[in-house]
Amino acid sequence: MSNVRSKICGITRIEDALAAAEAGADAIGFVFYAKSPRAVDVRQARAIIAELPPFVTTVGLFVNASRCELNEILEVVPLDLLQFHGDETPQDCEGYHRPWIKALRVRPGDDLEAACRLYAGARGILLDTYVPGVPGGTGEAFDWSLVPARLGKPIILAGGLSADNVGQAIAQVKPYAVDVSGGVEQAKGIKDAAKIEAFMRAVKQA
């Protein structure tokens, strides 16, 4: 049985958040990036969070957001953790009085160990698939052999995960956590409760 943590990202509906919690997800993610088909506004996020049971971490995903925009969201949405998924510098990620993680889009030749040292203040590093011009949610997996055995930070593995491949991903990479969005959807931004349940079952059995 696996102790790997899990996050269901791109939540836009209360029923999907509750399905994730019921299936045993440790965290749910809200995308505050207007260009994403999974984007939510503060009203949606607040309404969903208000219905959550305890012990489900709420994560806000941001892509090159201004400090002003981010602070305005944090004033009204009770987020536990921030996820920076753009070209943010370490300085851009600090100063919000919230723990944070940094997403890196993995390409051959990238020095992931150096990147982890650069983002020293991050609680973890999320590794995602590199697709030019697309900051995340690609639905494509990357070459997991590019991940070093030790990175010095908890690894959150993302990119094209589903119930069909997450067991293999966990066995190969041995991440702290896995992050899924498209792999548990019936349409972009609309989750499928059965797929969430199957994904969580595969994680626990890995």
Curated annotation (Swiss-Prot):
Substrates-to-products reaction catalysed: N-(5-phospho-beta-D-ribosyl)anthranilate = 1-(2-carboxyphenylamino)-1-deoxy-D-ribulose 5-phosphate
Task: Enumerate the CDD domains for this protein.
Answer: PRAI (cd00405)
Mind telling me which InterPro entries this protein's record contains?
A: Aldolase_TIM (IPR013785), PRAI_dom (IPR001240), RibuloseP-bd_barrel (IPR011060), TrpF_fam (IPR044643)
Broadest EC class assigned to this enzyme: isomerase
Q: Which UniProt keywords apply?
A: Amino-acid biosynthesis, Aromatic amino acid biosynthesis, Isomerase, Tryptophan biosynthesis
Keyword presence, Metal-binding: no
User: Could you say which EC number(s) this protein's record lists?
Assistant: 5.3.1.24
Give one GO molecular function term.
phosphoribosylanthranilate isomerase activity
What the record says about family reads: Belongs to the TrpF family.
Q: What is this protein called?
A: N-(5'-phosphoribosyl)anthranilate isomerase
